Amino acid sequence: VLTGEDKKHVQHIWGLLSGAEEDLGAEVLYRMFQSYPPTKTYFPHFDVTQGSEQIRGHGKKFMAALGNAVKNVDNLSQALSELSNLHAYNLRVDPVNFKFLSQCLQVALAARLGKEYSPEVHSAVDKFMAAVAAVLAEKYR
């Protein structure tokens, strides 16, 4: 459960990323494809090389969706409803992949933010991403 302090940490970190969302999103996706190669099966039409236009474009969408979740942290189910439907019913993404993406995001944040990504912030981001993953997986039940 996200506490008020957790929400502040997530919102603060998100503010630090302003302007770098596309680069970070591309880095996160590339990390996921490298660390968890089976995730590439959901993107058969993508050029999965580092910095490709497809990775950059989808990374930007990923970060925009997370930005929307950060803004609507108290109502994630409503904020992510369409995305949940898309991933569950149309794309049929295995929910375990949301955890993989979360791990890759956290590695990228730690590498990018250094000391700003304190243990408290890491914990808050982990809880936030777990909440996002849970909402995205709601439609699978």
Swiss-Prot record:
Positions bound to heme b: 58, 87
Protein keywords: Heme, Iron, Metal-binding, Oxygen transport, Transport
Protein's job: Involved in oxygen transport from the lung to the various peripheral tissues.
GO CC, alphabetical: blood microparticle; haptoglobin-hemoglobin complex; hemoglobin complex
Oligomer status and interactors: Heterotetramer of two alpha-D chains and two beta chains.
Family note: Belongs to the globin family.
UniProt cross-references to Gene3D superfamilies, sorted A to Z: Globins
GO function terms (MF aspect): haptoglobin binding; heme binding; iron ion binding; organic acid binding; oxygen binding; oxygen carrier activity; peroxidase activity
Name listed for the protein in its UniProt record: Hemoglobin subunit alpha-D
Keyword Heme listed: yes
Domain Globin, residue spans: 1-141
PROSITE patterns for this protein: GLOBIN
Tissues showing expression: Red blood cells.
One biological process term in Gene Ontology: hydrogen peroxide catabolic process
